[in-house]
Amino acid sequence: MQAAALLSGARGVTCKFIRRLRAGMDGCGMKFLFKRSLITGFLIGLQFVLIVLGIFTLSNKIVYVYAGLQVISLITLILVINKKDNPSYKLSWIVVILLLPPVGVIIYMMWGNTVFTRSVKNRINKSFETFRFQLPQNEQSEAKLRAFSRTYARQSEYLKRSTGHSVYNDTETDYYSPAEAAFPHILAELKKATRFIFIEFFILAEGKMWDEIHAVLREKAAEGVEIKIISDDIGSGDRQQEGFVRRLAAENIEMVSYNRFRPALNTFMNYRDHRKIIVIDGVTAITGGSNIGDEYINVIDRHGYWKDTFLILRGGAAISFTEMFLSMWQSITHKTYKLEDFCYNPQEECTDTNGFVHPYADSPFDNVDTAKNIYLQIINSARDYLYITTPYLVVDDEMLGALCLAAQSGVKVKIVTPKNGDHWYVHMMTRSSYGPLMEAGVQIYEYTPGFMHSKLIVADDEVATVGTVNMDYRSFYLHHECGVWLCHNKTVLDVRGDIDQAVAVSERIRLEAWNKRPAGTKLLEACLKLFTPLM
């Protein structure tokens, strides 16, 4: 009861504190210095500490409380073991619960448990399922892919069964890296809009990049084009000035935030919308690793030169991204839409000489690890080479084993990560993964010009994926993600060439040097491994 009272009181105090602090800063002209996520994060941490202190205080005074906590820990372990989840992911949480009682249980309840978010999950899943059954199925494209390769047809079939999206061979693709190379083309595509523009990004930050996009959106809204925008509240909250959404609404531009970040402990705050999507008239779609922010197009320097990607699709596959956006929009706004009202016009089909394009989405709420599984399929089917770029390399035993097995089977495996990390603890965990991979024969490179933010995988000059998926626990298990699987497509060679160029300016990490890391670094890496489910 005391712990519950502490939590209730902390929530009330923090909400009042946020309102008063914001009002005070607005009144003294300091509202742009106000970092909502920083203050909110601090207050959430304060609530966490108060709960832990309350539990320890009670358990030290009352033996029954201590015994009860042990029973709760045991029950939690049983629930985790029997949960329908990836075994490696479950094992990581079991270690946390066993080594940090009773704090480990609290951490799991806040960041690993999904029972308390069931109503929210059901609402989002219902929205996603509603649109999934409205997606067109392309049996002709599927037959052509089966005739080309049974192996790659099985990968595409998996994506279809797990997401509802089909494969297309009527879609042109243009790959751009770095992201600033795509920016003029993105503006040009936005200017072509006559019906609607949908935009969904994890980070939508004010600055030069946004200003140029906004100028086009404002013009198009004045022409009557329907414009809807989704941004993630944690990703974007601190990078938009006060009244940002209100000013857009005055220009007939609708904007909503996914999963508002509030100053109270809750189990849903861990799930974020990490997708990057632009859809224009249902005919053109844009995705990739880049967000909307000046560092992504190297207008400002953050962690050195920023290496990122965009992929522009024109043709039938654009409807998949229309569906992804509308399903998310409907889950947030509770408004009902029909995909047919925004669908692609078949009369504008491209030729079928562009290879195969299969968009896919991944949700943390459907108990299907789509992004991770398609990565595993590409890794396991590679024959000659497998190249990967990722900003983070924090993988479970299943992914680690697949990469090692590929290298041990004679496949040339190269992985490029950043030389400069954006989060020291994740960067340290990334580097801690190098050893077992290099021992198996995987070549590890660090991108020396700056920060490698591209999320790419390519194999055998035949198959690749471009999208938003990092090789870490958060992307595989906790985020909404999206990507494009490509086969027998010119973009596959573009991706391979891009990674070759990145390798040429990267530093190869050698096992001998890695083994000579300071003892303090090794100890800190070992401690951080306890928290891999959060990274």
Where are these regions (language model features)?
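N-terminal localization/anchoring segments of enzymes in phospholipid and broader phosphate metabolism
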Residues: 5-7, 14-373, 377, 381, ...
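Short, well-ordered secondary-structure micro-motifs
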Residues: 240, 399, 425-428, 457
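Phosphate-/nucleic-acid-contacting segments
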Residues: 385
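Thr-Gly-centered strand-to-loop micro-motif
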Residues: 388-390, 447, 466-467
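Helical hairpin unit composed of two closely spaced alpha helices linked by a short loop
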Residues: 392-413, 418, 423-425
